[in-house]
């Protein structure tokens, strides 16, 4: 499932599921399951991925103290077809970067905000907030957006 994360670069126990908890454990040589194995539905666009050169251009921009609009504006000007903002905490986006994101959306470029935090994702938001990636990491949100864009062009 989407909750599984690689937590360490080289340890044998490099993976974890954070707040979701374990799926199972091995006790006395036997597997003890706590819940069913997650099965993600196949995204409609996954079957027609083709060559990576034809994939939509979706970039990740990091929000931080003092973030400027120029990086997001430059990506949109260069032809980005989607933007994911890796926000602080609960997906917070610096004010100047948020204005640029709203400009991108107005120009037809989808934008999603995700959290840079390892666990928790983006929960709750005021009605005027930028669209949320939910519990997806910025990298997962980028892949989802690419698949959404591919599906939209195939339809």
Show the residue positions of the predicted features.
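Accessory alpha-helical/coil subdomains and C-terminal extensions
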Residues: 1-82, 88-90
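ATP/nucleoside-binding phosphotransfer catalytic cores, i.e., glycine-rich phosphate-binding loops
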Residues: 91, 95-155
């Amino acid at each position: 499932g989407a909750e599984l994360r690689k937590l360490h670069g080289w340890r044998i126990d490099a993976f974890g599921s954070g707040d979701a908890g374990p799926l199972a454990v091995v006790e006395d040589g036997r597997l003890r399951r706590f819940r069913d194995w997650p099965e993600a539905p196949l995204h409609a666009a996954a079957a027609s991925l083709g060559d990576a050169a034809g994939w939509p251009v979706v970039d990740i921009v990091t929000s931080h103290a003092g973030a400027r609009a120029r990086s997001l504006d430059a990506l949109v000007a260069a032809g980005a077809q989607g933007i994911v903002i890796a926000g602080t905490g609960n997906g917070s986006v610096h004010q100047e970067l948020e204005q640029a994101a709203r400009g991108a959306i107005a120009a037809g470029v989808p934008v999603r905000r995700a959290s840079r935090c390892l666990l928790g994702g983006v929960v709750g938001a005021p009605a005027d907030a930028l669209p949320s990636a939910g519990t997806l990491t910025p990298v997962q949100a980028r892949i989802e957006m690419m698949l959404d864009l591919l599906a939209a062009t195939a339809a």
